[in-house]
Amino acid sequence: MAKKVFKRLEKLFSKIQNDKVYGVEQGVGAVKSLASAKFDETVEVALRLGVDPRHADQMVRGAVVLPHGTGKKVRVAVFAKDIKQDEAKNAGADVVGGDDLAEEIKNGRIDFDMVIATPDMMAVVGKVGRILGPKGLMPNPKTGTVTMDIAKAVTNAKSGQVNFKVDKKGNIHAPIGKVSFPEEKIKENMLELVKTINRLKPNSAKGKYIRNAALSLTMSPSVSLDAQELMDIK
């Protein structure tokens, strides 16, 4: 098994130049050529930012609705009450509730990919924060998932909203589509993501903002991208 995996990776590495830095357009084409799995692999972009997340004013976090979606069917849970529950259901939310939903989560129910809540329900959400937080599901105003405009938030989530946040080392990883997408759609998704991240550059960040960038598939090696080209995207 290990030998078979090694041979597959060796074959993939032979298709790209390890020391080559690709422009956006060429990079998308190169990473698509690495598709080898028997399923529709996810295309992911990885960015190393010149920020220090230990400082609150250098935490880069946000959300973007990709123009062509991620190719993944997203299940959405909503914490709301009264008329806001109806708005959530009409917008297509998969799970809607309040205290009852919190109890279900405590009992192990995590069959959703994104959680949205109205501000007045955050005390209820807080009861399951230790469960949702580590899974990256905790609603946050910066990603538009704590809002009174429930219908818009659910629609965005279903349309391909991607939430992102730098990790402790200043990295952001985000899906930008499936390998089956046409190159142009993957490129447009990536440009929209990078444009949003560039807008969020902290004033206190010094030096080069995007230090390294790469594209990869679920089962492929990565392709290096021109970080300067990405920083120039406005």
UniProtKB/Swiss-Prot annotation:
InterPro entries reported in the protein's UniProt record: Ribosom_uL1_bac-type, Ribosomal_uL1, Ribosomal_uL1-like, Ribosomal_uL1/biogenesis, Ribosomal_uL1_3-a/b-sand, Ribosomal_uL1_CS
Keywords: Repressor, Ribonucleoprotein, Ribosomal protein, RNA-binding, rRNA-binding, Translation regulation, tRNA-binding
GO cellular component: cytosolic large ribosomal subunit
Keyword rRNA-binding: yes
GO-annotated biological processes: regulation of translation; translation
Entry's Gene Ontology molecular function annotations: rRNA binding; structural constituent of ribosome; tRNA binding
Ranges in a coiled coil: none
One Pfam family recorded for the sequence: Ribosomal_L1
HAMAP family cross-referenced by the UniProt entry: Ribosomal_uL1_B (MF_01318_B)
Subunit structure: Part of the 50S ribosomal subunit.
Function summary: Binds directly to 23S rRNA. The L1 stalk is quite mobile in the ribosome, and is involved in E site tRNA release. Protein L1 is also a translational repressor protein, it controls the translation of the L11 operon by binding to its mRNA.
The family this protein is said to belong to: Belongs to the universal ribosomal protein uL1 family.
The name this protein goes by in its record: Large ribosomal subunit protein uL1
